[in-house]
Amino acid sequence: MTKFLGIFIVLGIGIGIGISTKQQWITVFYGVPVWKNSSVQAFCMTPTTRLWATTNCIPDDHDYTEVPLNITEPFEAWADRNPLVAQAGSNIHLLFEQTLKPCVKLSPLCIKMNCVELKGSATSTPATSTTAGTKLPCVRNKTDSNLQSCNDTIIEKEMNDEAASNCTFAMAGYIRDQKKNYSVVWNDAEIFCKRSTSHNGTKECYMIHCNDSVIKEACDKTYWDELRLRYCAPAGYALLKCNDWDYAGFKPECSNVSVVHCTTLMNTTVTTGLLLNGSYSENRTQIWQKHGVSNDSVLILLNKHYNLTVTCKRPGNKTVLPVTIMAGLVFHSQKYNTRLRQAWCHFQGNWKGAWKEVQEEIVKLPKERYQGTNDTNKIFLQRQFGDPEAANLWFNCQGEFFYCKMDWFLNYLNNLTVDADHNHCKNNAGKGRSPGPCVQRTYVACHIRSVINDWYTISKKTYAPPREGHLQCTSTVTGMTVELNYNNQNRTNVTLSPQIETIWAAELGRYKLVEITPIGFAPTEVRRYTGGQERQKRVPFVLGFLGFLGAAGTAMGAAATALTVQSQHLLAGILQQQKNLLAAVGAQQQMLKLTIWGVKNLNARVTALEKYLADQARLNAWGCAWKQVCHTTVPWTWNNTPEWNNMTWLEWEKQIEGLEGNITKQLEQAREQEEKNLDAYQKLSDWSSFWSWFDFSKWLNILKIGFLAVIGVIGLRLLYTLYTCIARVRQGYSPLSPQIHIHPWKGQPDNAGEPEEGGRTGKSKSTH
């Protein structure tokens, strides 16, 4: 009894478990707010209507919609971990190539030239060194009694004339067997010469870049002015933005995240050392370190409260002359009536206050990010050495490349009177009117060069000489790109860095480009009905695209109930973005100016279409086309189960990321089997199968099957009979059958005790 009771208990428990644990099936959801990092090519929008802008970017729609997301997301600002920042470096370089496009090879000019230094009418009175008690010229801060106000006249008094030489050379021109003499004016910084050996000061010179394999000169001088643009995500993609107050270029968990279609307008000014005209500036100083710890690549965003600006000028006029060497080779030279004055840049605003705040922010850095001195008086700003672009403040002003030596201004910020090697000058007299390197000034001398080192590729480019007339540009200084260096003297050097990529990290570092993956999997208790199904066609509503991702921070259950609307948002956004891009490509084709960026825009459109078609193809392969919630016949065999009321789709996707391959494979196999079953069902219901019963070959097959069945039955009967016989033989002889009846003798005497003949019996005979 106890044994049977235990069996019933076990069966009861099993039935209870079976009732409480229902079978779950894989369900496909389309329209879930899930994404992954992407490196797809973004496209640009711009409000500028110049030719370059209209042939490379689509017109700005002025849509700055931003939808907050209740999630946490990692962000990284530098190019090696942020594809959007890496794209900016490549794209802005293309902008340079198209607007200041070198196209004429200058290798024939790598020959010996006879050069004579240009002499002008300007005087060359040596400048006197600044001594204690002498007022420093040209400083805006009127609160300091030792400083005076500034104007252009005061600055230009300390600017020397441009050092240049008139060079002549002979080479074959139109007539190849005869040489012709040509004359070209070079800046002294662009040639190297032997010592003068003649009485008239003629020197043998060569181009300083003669050893370079490819040197080209710009075809035309293109006027360069400010171009602002914004990056936009292609259809099917989005931009996430980190809005955390303490974001410093790297944060594993940014909690204040929003989704946008495009970035804010960014500037395309390329500089070394200082950030000009940046789009991101606040009333505070921020220090960004690469990957959160590096001191080799540091971005300092300056406080906009100090109104930091820089005004650069190139005074005077200039005449540009074309020198035709041969057919198809025209070199633009310049002719001086007198030697021109140097260009210069004047730094305005409260730079001392801004630099003091930078020093204070540096010492506040955590110990794992900064191990230098905590004494702000021992933190100094200095410049680098090496290439001219690294050793100087390098930037482009109205199409001309300025190289400005920062020593005077750095001395002013550091309150020192030293040279670039931190040595005090015994005699601070310079050449000509310019003072020596150990003075403090709020302005610096600049040179304009035609041969520059390319900032994106390892090459050099030669551009046309500076344009005629007066050059001037004013820029807002929004940051600095630096390196933090420590030494044994308990001193921290903040060294201006030529890393151009840091500029784009400052502009785009708060954004990340993501690909929307709207297909999700989760277990439900609903199994697909495998009968005939009608395909439902749905027409999307024209709704906001960013609203689709707005549900990223909500629970899975709440998001799943709105999948129809979310998928419509997604499709409507894709269609609208495609329409905008198609209009841009059409405009570019009309102008016959499908530039490199135009091709990128076209590629972005094709990528979006491919992505949408790929998603639909996957859904169709599982039998889920045009469905927002698609139940399947595939059982859910894994232990993972979602918390529909507490878990977001992003969190759930991270749990099952490794299972997606198995899930999709099983869905494809189930769909294939379902198609086979449906095909067999359709064949049974087909009228053409009725006539197949009159096929003679089919009847032969039926007879064959029947004959084999009869043979099988007979064989089984024989085996059974044989088995029965063998079983009886093994049991031995059987006893007499109890059915045989023995009749007794009626008059048998009692012969007990008398011996009888054994076993003899007989019938009695009657006697009369």
From Swiss-Prot:
Which keywords describe this protein according to UniProt? Answer: Apoptosis, Cleavage on pair of basic residues, Coiled coil, Disulfide bond, Fusion of virus membrane with host membrane, Glycoprotein, Host cell membrane, Host endosome, Host membrane, Host-virus interaction, Membrane, Signal, Transmembrane, Transmembrane helix, Viral attachment to host cell, Viral envelope protein, Viral penetration into host cytoplasm, Virion, Virus entry into host cell
Residue ranges annotated as Extracellular topological domain: 17-701
Which residues of this protein are annotated with the site description Cleavage?
R538, V539
Give the region (Fusion peptide) as residue ranges. 539-559
Ranges for the region named Disordered are 744-768
Mind listing the GO molecular function terms for this protein? structural molecule activity
Q: In its UniProt entry, what is this protein called?
A: Envelope glycoprotein gp160
Organism, by scientific name, is Simian immunodeficiency virus agm.vervet (isolate AGM155) (SIV-agm.ver)
The gene it comes from is env
